[in-house]
A protein has these predicted regions:
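Contiguous mid-protein beta-loop-alpha structural module that forms a pocket-lining wall or clamp
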Residues: 176-183, 190-191
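Acidic, low-complexity, intrinsically disordered peripheral segments
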Residues: 389-398
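Short, solvent-exposed loop/turn positions at domain surfaces
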Residues: 66-67, 139, 214, 267, ...
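Short amphipathic alpha-helical coiled-coil/interface segments
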Residues: 170, 191-199, 361, 382-387
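A short glycine-rich beta-alpha junction/loop motif
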Residues: 6-9, 82-85, 98-106, 115-118, ...
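Non-catalytic DNA-recognition/assembly elements of restriction-modification systems
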Residues: 1-24, 152-167, 187, 197, ...
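Sequence-specific dsDNA recognition surfaces
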Residues: 14-30, 45-75, 95, 226-275, ...
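Short, ligand-facing micro-motifs at secondary-structure edges
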Residues: 47-59, 78-81, 85-102, 118-122, ...
């Protein structure tokens, strides 16, 4: 922190504020859902936008409040989390003035009246602050930032009038950026709805409201996966000769039920599934579906399905399972068993129509995927713009 403008100083946090930790509940006491008027603020209540989520706020009884009353936080204090999620910060809303603060956070009580609380909040969002707390954080089972180390954090501090000018610029700029981010996030939600709508139209073209075995067009019929598959099997044990990378001998991919890298965990020398097929995770991320066109070796918790090619299009089934399993039971069952999977009923149109449906869904999903990538990149760009503004602000260049 050099070459700061005239009138700026570099101060340690302990030089400008008393940093006080919160307090855990006394042994045997529990948080309450009913409003006792005595609020207890947890790190779980800290929102990303620098305030407190009031939707699931917890309370304590009056006796507990009296025991903890020395650990109150006020609306002119800044809070910072020091355990678990380190460095999450914000300003207490007026309706929570005087609430009790968790032991996993601290409050800043300013020693002098020449400090803007909002300026300090923006500082805690900056990489200048984040880099310092990362080097000061003790990495254990639950990351912890000691108050003694937090006190040593350095901040570039201009006169109060300049702090307020900087806050005004950042407030206005961040408001515009946040509005753009909000639009992009809504666009992403709209894309998800578009994909679900496309699947709904594809597999329930008559828009029947029945939950199961709804009415189908003429020439369509309900079929179990067992009826339209050449083989459905569960993966075996991981091969003993499995290697992380391809070798001269090991060229066959080994797949598990993971999502990362489409479940690839290594390579072996023999395939147990030769024909084009589909895999679906039976545990963990239930219902994660992949098309496998090359020979491979599936291992435990991964189900493989080889379709009867004369009646079932592999790409059609891919989209169908994404609709019926991922949308339906995927998140609510502990595991997907072979008998349950075999008995799953899907709507089956003639093969040519399956191919047309799959081609249309491919087009829709490719377009939405491209838009998702674009919107996600734009979101990242906006976050980088925020950091750029903060970086300039605390170098005195704004």
């Amino acid at each position: 922190m050099t070459n700061l403008p005239q009138g700026w100083e570099v101060k340690k946090l302990e030089e400008i504020a008393n940093i006080k930790g919160g307090k855990r509940l006394p042994k045997g006491e529990n948080l309450l859902d009913n409003n006792t008027k005595f609020t207890y603020i947890r790190v779980a209540d800290f929102q990303d936008n620098g305030t407190i989520n009031l939707q699931n706020i917890k309370f304590i009884n009056e006796n507990t409040y009296n025991v903890l009353k020395n650990y109150k936080i006020y609306d002119d204090n800044l809070y910072i989390s020091i355990a678990g999620t380190i460095g999450k910060s914000g300003i207490i809303p007026k309706e929570l003035n005087g609430a009790i603060l968790t032991e996993n956070a601290v409050k800043l009580e300013y020693i002098q009246n020449n400090i803007s609380n909002k300026f300090m909040y923006f500082f805690t969002l900056s990489n200048i602050f984040k880099t310092q707390i990362q080097t000061s954080t003790k990495i254990v089972a639950q990351p912890k930032l000691a108050i003694t180390r937090l006190k040593q954090i350095q901040i570039p501090l201009p006169p109060l009038k300049e702090q307020e000018r900087i806050v005004g610029i950042l407030d206005e700029s961040f408001a515009k950026i946040d509005e753009s981010i909000k639009i992009l996030e809504q666009n992403l939600l709209n894309l998800d709805e578009l994909m679900q709508s496309a699947l709904q139209k594809a597999f329930n073209p008559l828009k029947d409201n029945a939950k199961e075995n709804y009415k189908l067009p003429q020439s369509w019929e309900w079929k179990s996966l067992e009826e339209i598959s050449e083989n459905i099997s569960a993966g075996g044990d991981k091969p003993k000769n499995c290697t992380e990378s391809k070798t001269a001998k090991n060229q066959i991919p080994v797949y598990a039920n993971g999502v990362n890298n489409n479940g690839l965990v290594g390579y072996t020398d023999k395939a147990t599934i030769i024909k084009p097929s589909l895999t679906i995770s039976a545990r963990g991320t239930i219902g994660f579906v992949c098309i496998r066109k090359e020979p491979y070796f599936p291992i435990v918790r991964l189900i493989s399905l080889i379709p009867c090619e004369n009646i079932l299009c592999l790409h059609y089934l891919y989209f169908c399972l994404n609709f019926f399993i991922a949308k339906g039971e995927g998140s609510s069952i502990p595991q997907l068993t072979i008998p349950k999977f075999k008995s799953l009923q899907i709507p089956l149109p003639p093969l040519k129509e399956q191919e047309q449906i799959a081609k249309h869904l491919d087009f829709v999903f490719e377009k939405t995927k491209a838009l998702k990538e674009l919107y996600t990149k734009e979101l990242k760009d906006y976050e980088e713009l925020k950091q750029s503004l903060l970086n300039k602000a605390f170098k005195g260049e704004l």
